[in-house]
Every structure is written in structure tokens, then in C-alpha cells.
Regions:
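Thiol-/selenol-based redox modules, centered on thioredoxin-like
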Residues: 131, 135-164
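Short active-site neighborhood of thiol/selenol oxidoreductases, capturing the structured segment around
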Residues: 53-68, 78
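Alpha-helical transmembrane signal-anchor/signal-peptide segments
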Residues: 27-46
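Hydrophobic membrane-insertion alpha-helices, especially the h-region
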Residues: 2-27
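A short, hydrophobic beta-strand/beta-hairpin element that forms part of a small beta-sheet core
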Residues: 78, 119-137
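A short beta-strand-turn-helix
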Residues: 42-57
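Short acidic, S/G/P-rich loop/turn micro-motifs used as interaction or catalytic elements
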Residues: 64-70, 102, 138-139
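Structured, soluble extracytoplasmic/luminal domains of envelope-associated proteins
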Residues: 75-120
Length: 164
């Protein structure tokens, strides 16, 4: 009877540890993530990024020279995304990676990055690290869903990093 409280105490300490161990080993915990974009498989840091001042996040469109129709659609989507940011426009830059045929774009143009997919949108942090990819889909509805996902991810990131 004297050892009963001690056994209860030890049991209360050990049972959660055993359950946590079993949950990890038997994969009872789902491995879901809340981001809509795809993390890149390799780290890509843009060269010459530090030479100019950048805002917290940059939405970038990879626009190689051979990309025409898909990139033109994505340019229009990029403009709509920037408008949809609303009050957060001051915290986000927009950039084009490569050369466009439109000369009057209000966004920064940076050198093309060969390892990135053509016509895809990317989120780049203020240090020049490409963080998330949002691939281009030829089906307009799927493309709109991808762009909405980018907007959700960006708003989450801006909310998490409340500096400036």
C-alpha cells in the first residue's frame, strides 16, 4: 500500500513516453504540411542578389527566352497576384528571371536561372534563397489554384515574420 502512490507516479511518467515512442515508430502521426508550394530539392541561391535592396519576399517568374505563351499568361497572373496582396504590397517585390518581350514592366528583371522550370513562379527570401516553387499548369483552373496557394503561403510567411 505504501508503494502504490510511487507506482502511480512512475506509471504517469512512463505511459506518455511509451505512447510518444510508439506514435513515432509506428507512424501514427500524419506527415502533412500546410504549404501549397513545392520545396526545391536542391538549394538555389541567386547570384548578385545582395547588390540591390530587396523586400522581405519576392515573387519571381522564371522567363527564359524560348518561353512565349505560358510566360505571357504567367506575367498576367503575376500582375493579378501583386494586386491581390493589397496592404502587403509594400513587403513584397516582384521580379522576372530572364528577358521578356514587354519593355514597360514595372518589376525588376534579373538574369535567367537555368535550373528553374520555365513559366513557374517562385518565392524568394530577402537573402536570395529560392524557397518555394509553384509550377505552371496548362489548364487555367489548375493554374489559378496554384496561384491562390502562392498567395496563401505568402500571407502566412508575412504573418510569421512581422518585422518591418
Amino acid at each position: 500500500m505504501k508503494n502504490n502512490p510511487l507506482l502511480i507516479f512512475i506509471g504517469c511518467c512512463l505511459v506518455p513516453l511509451i505512447l510518444a515512442y510508439l506514435a513515432l515508430k509506428l507512424e501514427w502521426i500524419p506527415s502533412a504540411s500546410s504549404n501549397k508550394g513545392e520545396f526545391l530539392k536542391q538549394e538555389i541561391k541567386l547570384q548578385d542578389w545582395k547588390k540591390t535592396e530587396h523586400k522581405q519576399w519576392t515573387i519571381a517568374l522564371n522567363h527564359p527566352a524560348q518561353c512565349q505563351q505560358a510566360c505571357a499568361q504567367q506575367l498576367q497572373a503575376l500582375e493579378n497576384l501583386y494586386i491581390a496582396l493589397g496592404k502587403n504590397q509594400g513587403k513584397v517585390d516582384v521580379a522576372i528571371l530572364g528577358q521578356t518581350q514587354q519593355k514597360e514592366l514595372p518589376w525588376r528583371q534579373l538574369p535567367e536561372v537555368d535550373v528553374l522550370q520555365p513559366a513557374s513562379l517562385y518565392l524568394i527570401d530577402h537573402m536570395g534563397l529560392v524557397v518555394l516553387q509553384y509550377p505552371y499548369h496548362s489548364e487555367p483552373q489548375q493554374n489559378r489554384l496554384t496561384q491562390k496557394g502562392l498567395l496563401k503561403d505568402l500571407k502566412k510567411l508575412l504573418n510569421y515574420s512581422r518585422s518591418s
